[in-house]
């Protein structure tokens, strides 16, 4: 099955499951009160967290006057931040607080890259809160970043033009998170194809799932790449980027490629640090918000 066919199937699944619409409530409805919930896996790295600040700033410009709150899906990161005195809600806690505060319509911006396991868990929980009697009138979950061929092409073009110091013949490997045992993992394969159509020295691999770094190394050798840039295909350059990708441990991508004879230069900049990419997420949020 060709890559484009795989992408079509996966994105069709995304369209089927990409928005949680609360069931209509019977009886008298309270006045409409709208809110936006920004949801990310999360990060405990202050530098990486600046990307989320950029997203919120951009979102407030696009949706002035709308209540905005944050939620992190990672329990470990929430616990780590709590020990530092920074309290972040889980999506479920954030939904409950919004409901208690009388919000009737909630649009959720998922800062996930693909509609993988975490995205669908978020969708399912949003749907459950939307069904609760006496709660929200409507809850909609906006699509994640890579939700269409156009989104993928735009992301690829933005990332490729933001690699400082790259010369002809230098290769780039973009690190995705990956997801095991989930059909959305095929999006990384499709994204690799998108990069290849633009730049034959650009590749995608993932920390988890089927698209490992080991599948890319033979291609780097075939292309006779002298230098390899490593770039996160994640919203922030957090733990995975700083340790799994750019760390000094023997099992980091930098160390593995260096041991294979490549010169390696990591770039610690997440996708949410590029305004053109942030605007893709916000267009998805706008699409959800127009249904209110």
Residue ranges, per PLM feature:
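Position-driven detector of the extreme protein N-terminus
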Residues: 2, 13-14, 24
């Amino acid at each position: 099955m060709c890559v484009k066919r795989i992408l079509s199937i996966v994105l069709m699944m995304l369209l089927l499951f990409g928005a949680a619409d609360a069931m209509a409530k019977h009886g008298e409805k309270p006045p409409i009160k709208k809110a936006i919930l920004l949801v990310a896996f999360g990060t405990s790295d202050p530098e990486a967290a600046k990307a989320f600040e950029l997203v919120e700033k951009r979102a407030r410009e696009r949706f002035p006057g709308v209540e905005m709150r944050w939620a992190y899906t990672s329990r470990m990161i929430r616990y780590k931040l709590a020990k530092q005195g920074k309290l972040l809600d889980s999506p479920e806690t954030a939904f409950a607080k919004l409901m208690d505060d009388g919000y009737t319509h909630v649009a959720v911006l998922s800062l996930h890259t693909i509609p993988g396991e975490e995205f669908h868990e978020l969708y399912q929980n949003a749907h459950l809160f939307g069904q609760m009697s006496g709660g929200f009138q409507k809850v909609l979950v906006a699509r994640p970043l890579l939700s269409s061929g156009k989104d993928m092409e735009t992301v690829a073009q933005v990332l490729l033009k933001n690699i400082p110091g790259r010369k002809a013949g230098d290769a780039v490997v973009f690190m995705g998170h990956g997801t095991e045992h989930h059909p959305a993992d095929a999006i990384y394969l499709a994204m690799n194809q998108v990069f290849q159509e633009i730049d034959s020295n650009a590749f995608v691999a993932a920390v988890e799932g089927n698209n490992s770094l080991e599948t890319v190394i033979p291609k780097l050798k075939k292309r006779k790449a002298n230098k390899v840039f490593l770039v996160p295909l994640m919203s922030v350059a957090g733990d995975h980027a700083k340790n799994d990708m750019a760390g000094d441990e023997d099992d980091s991508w930098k160390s593995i490629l260096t041991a294979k004879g490549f010169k390696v230069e990591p770039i610690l900049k997440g996708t949410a640090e590029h305004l053109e990419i942030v605007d893709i997420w916000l267009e998805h949020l706008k699409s959800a918000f127009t249904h209110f």
